Amino acid sequence: MSSSLSDRSALVLDLGARYVRCGISGERAPRCVERWQVGDMLQKPLSAAEWRQYLYPKLHALCFDLLLVNPTRRRFVVCEDLLLPRVFRETLLNILFDVLKASAVTVVPSMMAVLYATTNHTALVVDCGWAETRLLPVFKGIPLPYLYETVSVGSRNCCEVIKRELNVYRDQPMDGSKLVTPITETMAEDILERACFAQQKDPLPNVVDAEFQTQDMQVSGNLRTAAVEQLLSGDDGTDGTSIVDGIIHVLKKAPLDIRAAMLENLLLVGGTAMIPGLAQRVVAEVREALRHDNEFASASDAVGRAQLVQTYFPRNMLAWVGGSIYAATDSARVSAISSQEYSSSKGTSIPDWLTVAEEEF
């Protein structure tokens, strides 16, 4: 009985830039969410040895210390970004097969996995992450990778604003004898998660300040909303591009006959999308921008129907939940790479996603 259960349940990994989520297939939430530094490490080229030195302790701790399962002869389902470096993917597979002794591994794009956690097969998936926002249209279950787009704006931009503004005040304490700890990136992220939100088109007139007793600091009502505006205005190191700009750019590149379907099925996912009010504000900004765009003048009805895909799980967990559901399907087993196939191909059995798309479509 236990061997049958082990064969059915897979270990599901959702690899984000800031966090990795891990759990057992068929469950509704990951068992552990751990911070890691992959997003920062991707800013410069790394060798396979450097990736192995970082990834092996992380994966070992996830399986043995946090999940408390033996990964030997277990299936893995890995939800990853479309454009992760090949050396990262090869090193990851090498650790899973040669060190953790996985029986099979299924690699699925996280922006496709999210649809398994919804009732939709069509959506413009907007993955709002730590360092960037990624956009991928999916029409009737078929991804359109030639429309894939990235925007250099994410939670990190918001945290930089919070750090800069708060450190200006903390550098000049009222009590000169009192040492004040400068705001770190981790503290700024905590403030963003707990105190910040996106104003709507009709903004609240008076936003109260937020006090953090543990750090002896006060976040002004203006900063609570101004930090999030970086995602919508494209200032402060984002090359003048915002999430709304990215969505409109993808819509303009998309074929005419799918634009309405994309507008009616906007799916915002990722940790940054958890900021209260952000998803609703993005849709409102998209509607407003397209109403003044001559290219969409003949599609005013579709612009008015722009709306979010209804979600049944937290937006930052959708990729993992989708991977958990997908892992229980026959498709996951059919597309899996077994340890025998991996060994016989000497680790070359994982092509790039864009190569797969080119061959199939």
Regions found by a protein language model. Give the residues of each.
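Structured C-terminal portions of repeat-based eukaryotic scaffold domains
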Residues: 251-268, 272-307
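Glycine-rich phosphate-binding loops at beta-strand->alpha-helix junctions
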Residues: 80-89, 196, 200, 264-285, ...
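Conserved phosphate-binding catalytic cores of ATP/NTP-utilizing and phosphoryl-transfer enzymes
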Residues: 1-5, 102-126
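Conserved phosphate-binding loops in N-terminal lobes of ATP-dependent enzymes
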Residues: 2-95, 104, 145-147, 166, ...
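Acidic, glycine/GT-rich loop-and beta-edge segments that sit at the periphery of enzyme/chaperone cores
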Residues: 174-182, 295-361
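Phosphate-binding glycine-rich/basic clefts of nucleotide- and phosphate-handling proteins
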Residues: 139, 143-240, 244, 262-265
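Phosphate/ATP-binding catalytic cores across multiple sugar-kinase/actin-like superfamilies
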Residues: 58-66, 224-261, 281
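A short acidic Gly-Thr/Ser loop motif
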Residues: 5, 13-19, 118-120, 125-134, ...
